[in-house]
Amino acid sequence: MLPCTIVRKPLLLFVLAIAVRAVLFLHFPDPAYPDSYYYVDVAQSLAAGHGFNIDFIWIFVEVGGKIPANPVLPIPADAHWMPLASIVQVPFIWLLGPTTLASSLPFILLGALSAPMAWGLARDAGASERVALGAGLLTAIPVLATPFMAQPDNFGLYQPLVVGALWAGGRGLKGHGRSFALAGALVALATLARSDGILVGVTLGLLFVADRGRAWRSGGVRRPAIPLWAGIACAGLFLLVAGPWFARQLTVFGSLSPSSSTGKVLLIRTFSEWNSITIPATVDHFLGQGLGPLIASRVGGLVAAVTIYAVLVGGVVLVPFMLIGGWLRRRSLDFSPAFLYAGILFAFNALFFAVHVPGGTFIHSAIGLAPHSYVLVMEGIAASVGWVAARRRGWDVEQATRVFSGAAVAFAVVAGAAASLTTHATWASRVADHQFAAAALDAAGAPFTDRVMSIDASGTRYWSGRGGVVLVNDPLPTVEQVARAYEIRWLILERSDAVPAVAPILDGGARPAWIGPPIASRPAAPSSTGVELPPGSVDVAVYPVCVAPDDTRCSGALAGAATGSLP
């Protein structure tokens, strides 16, 4: 009976998690934002036999943070993002073709593993069956983070790798050397999914050192829990799995972390500088903001990280129980890796990635902590009920615990469904803009070799099939330099996501001579803030770009034929 239970419950959790992610996919099957577009674009290039090469620049850190001396397309892929989210799609694309199902299916299947893993780590840590089951259910439907779990992005991929590595690390502290060794391979895969996966490796390294330090201080009374061979095997497996990719980075880019070497990742004052090629990314520029703004930005990054985690993973309501459970488990070997990783992750993002935290950098990594957090939530609920019941004679501890545990899961279901509906609606609006622009280019007879400038170059590539470059957050003369360097033929502007330099154009104002009349535009909807927009304002428009001497599309003679709108 026991073996059947051990297999049945995690299997049911796995099936439930797949079902949740399948519903998400059916409701919104497409990639939704630059990260997921990028991973799909690279995957399709790999599947087509073109290797790690792409014909667009989604951000200029991919080519050194400026217009290179030899501005060419295609370029080597993954100078900033890591390759695993693209690699896992390739077999499915070969099998099913370049479809949305082929790109999302690996993330649905792999991400669903986190639910039974939450159950397993809870039981391995000595938690009750109710706690383990509740944690598995919450991981299957992770509150306000639910909408992201079927995207061809790292949410579904990174989470089980981090959970597995931290779980294996905890087992290592209890004397399971093989588990600790296996963690090295999981850390390598996590790092190939996200570069800050290396922080999980730092966590395990610190645990290994601390374990041997305690043994040394005991004067030989206590032996290390983690055998030396396990530590060596852990490091060896990491190098074996991740080493080839880092060798590729050194060969292609001359750096283990090409984007970081530009300074644009760490040495920017505000997130708006991330997409600029004129603002310097130097130590002098970074420190020149002054001590006050520097400290304020770091504190702001920490506050943003805590808020994002509390809202998306905890739905705010579950956070108090998460903290109670954390306090009860503060000395638990099973949770030591998760607690240490959480501290490192929050500190690292606050100190080094502060301005990137609100843009999604943090939650992509922090999602790996969700299953451990949900175990703590369920234990916190049980402890809270027990505390109240001890002071209220009329309470039935068993029944009350069951009711409040069920309420937590019900809250996650309702919150996850509501978040998915609203988030998908926002994504659908952006997709409509992409589709509008792609249809305009097709209607104009633009060859697929034409290059396009847009704020989301990876999304433009996905929807229109045309490569190009990102619209940089710089003055129009700099934008023109980029257009000339890369022989851009078209410009897509979207009011929902634009840089300040093009605001007058979206408002129907004057255009520079190298930007022609729009071939298609959609009139601006009334402002939600009540601010009246100027006559002629548009929400999305496609303009010809004339940087070649013989290009006459931007002349006044073509204005009558070039203006208009698509249905």
Residue ranges of predicted features:
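Membrane-embedded, lumen/periplasm-facing catalytic core of multi-pass transferases
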Residues: 399-459, 472, 476, 480-485, ...
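Multi-pass, polyprenyl lipid-linked donor-dependent membrane glycosyltransferases
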Residues: 34-37, 102-112, 134-164, 169, ...
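Signature aromatic-anchored transmembrane alpha helix within multi-pass, membrane-resident enzymes
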Residues: 11-15, 130-133, 185, 202-208, ...
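Hydrophobic, aromatic-rich transmembrane alpha-helices
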Residues: 4, 212-216, 296-346, 380-383
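Hydrophobic/aromatic-rich transmembrane helices and adjacent perimembrane loops
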Residues: 115, 155-158, 190-193, 199-202, ...
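Transmembrane-helix motifs of polytopic, lipid-linked glycan transferases
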Residues: 10-11, 105-126, 164
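Transmembrane alpha-helix segments characteristic
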Residues: 12-19, 139, 185-187, 316-321, ...
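Membrane-interface transmembrane helices that cradle and orient dolichyl/undecaprenyl
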Residues: 4, 123-126, 165-182, 210-218
